[in-house]
Amino acid sequence: MAKRVTSIGGQALLEGILMVGPKKNVAAFCDEAGNITTEEVSTPSLREKYPILKKPFIRGVFSMVDTLRLGMKALTLSADKVGGEEEEEPSKFEKWLEKKFGDKVMNAVVAVGGVLGVALAVLLFFFLPAVLFNGLMMLTGDGISGWRSVFEGLLRIVIFVLYIVVISKMPEIDRTFRYHGAEHKTIFCYENDLPLTVENVRKQKRFHPRCGSSFMILMLLLGIIIGFFIPFSNPFLRTFCKLLCLPIVVSIGYELIKLCGKYDNVLTRIIAAPGLWFQRLTVKEPTDMMMEAAIAAMKAVIPENGEDIIR
């Protein structure tokens, strides 16, 4: 068990790591020459502006919004840095688009891509499982109707796991998962009150109970429970109701993850177990350079007065 628990968290980036501290957030990037640079990343926080949003069972949704905004900004920054190293001459068509529309066309492409991504996620994780179960009921009869939520929930988990397995075969994603490992190991090293060196970080565990991967699996499992209370079998109505219930799932999942990170007992270990298993897919052993980047980002966000220590 760790000697202390910190509120500092992180996120793996493209050839880098973001560490999120109580006062500031810092990203560390590695270039092809092995040099490490750090850069502060900030976005307006709803929770800092409105303290009531920090209350239990309210903070989960707004914490997720803040995390997504900060994460997207850091990912965009890391993509720009990676793209800058591999910059290619733009085609004539790209030059024409830039001359004609400027940044507007890129903003439009990003917006359309985001909308299509959300639509695909809703289709795969909400609509498709409901349609498939209706088809299964047509073949077997109404006797299995009580298993609807279990079937849909397990199918969502299978789809999500398969998606992670497939993308993990991509070299860029594999490296990102290794940076994820560097993030976890560095946080564990700090929580165990050890000097932040590559040698000490390397010895730490890869799997952390407060990981975002664990949060995703926990939300999928909570979705099964919520599904029992949705009476509709129509795929459109069922999908709509599940989307309405997302804030509830996020809020409960966030509080459970906070408990698992703060306390170590039989109950929290049971809650954390599925997420820790899933991290075997999303958290891999890092290289020394990745650990050095994580250490650089971590040192930059550790406050002097210890206000990050929550236990």
PLM feature segments, named:
Residues 29, 63, 67-98, 178-196, ...:
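Short, charged cytosolic
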Residues 1-83, 90:
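Divalent-cation
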Residues 105-123, 204-229:
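Transmembrane alpha-helical segments and their cytosolic interface motifs
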Residues 2-13, 17-19, 146-217, 259-263, ...:
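Polar-ligand-bearing catalytic/cofactor-coordination segments
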Residues 106, 110, 114, 148-156, ...:
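Residue-level signature of transmembrane alpha-helical entry/exit and packing/kink sites
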Residues 93-104, 133-151, 230-240, 259-269, ...:
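Membrane interface segments of multi-pass transport proteins and intramembrane proteases
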Residues 77, 117-141, 219-241, 246-250, ...:
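Juxtamembrane "helix exit" motif at the C-terminal ends of alpha-helical transmembrane segments
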Residues 2-3, 7, 12-13, 47-54, ...:
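Cytosolic juxtamembrane amphipathic/interface segments immediately preceding
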